[in-house]
Amino acid sequence: MTYNLEFDSRALKEFQKMGEPVKLQFKKKLAEVLEQPHIPANRLRGLPDCYKIKLRASGYRLVYQVIDVQIVVLVLSVGKRERSGVYQTAKQRL
């Protein structure tokens, strides 16, 4: 079953500010996530039904929440990992 992709409006702005190579990498990963969103290795503690996509080379992270009832993957936050900022932002947006 394929999930639908939605962005929090603030996360969409963060995503649009990124460079094209980083966006393309996230798009590839998001396409995989929409097929299989529950990846145990990427699950985040302390954030209900939230997972991460990380781009190790560039240091960027994307945090998404899986809403099974609506069959939706909701992107909460996109940014650098520095000082766990992307995770703190996602927690505030829940």
Regions of interest found by a model, annotated:
Residues 31-55:
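A short, surface-exposed loop/turn module that caps and links secondary-structure elements
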